[in-house]
Amino acid sequence: QVFHDKCDSYLGIDYSEDLIEIAKENYNYDNCHFQVLSASQLDTADLLVSAPFDIVIITGVLIYFNDDTIKKMIKDLNSLCASNKTIYIRETLSFLETRLTLKDFFSENLEADYNAIYRTDDEFLDFINGIDGNITIETGEIFDELKNFTETGYKYFLIKSVN
């Protein structure tokens, strides 16, 4: 809803069929497309909207992928971007000196076991350094009011091409 009148076309992807159906029902605009697709297996032939993309938004998904997969995703996404790209990443990070890895961890909030890798700032910056071209990087903490744990918190990374 925020983007439909600010762009020629919008493509939202998610691995969850249920979430894609909710998006289709709630955001039924001619220029908005939603697609079930794994972010780790992007192929231009499969996309409902043709590349190149000016803006890419990645939120809350990278904690579920291993390092090699994230490096591949960054490379694949970069190849789908226009030369004047903006990439926004919002992720939960470790506020410890090292990453925090949870495997088969029971969450009372989720009422289920889950796996996640909460990486450090430096680890994320290493991923971002894999983006081609002359870029600027802005980063900061957000959603302080949602910070329930001292070990983790939300951060954003705003990567822009410098032409």
Predicted regions and their residues:
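Short catalytic micro-motifs in class I SAM-dependent methyltransferases
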Residues: G60-Y64
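A conserved beta-strand element that flanks and buttresses the S-adenosyl-L-methionine
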Residues: I57
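Local beta-strand N-terminus motif with an aromatic residue
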Residues: P52-F53
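Class I (Rossmann-like) S-adenosyl-L-methionine-dependent methyltransferase catalytic domain
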Residues: Q1-L47, F65-K72, D76, K85-N163
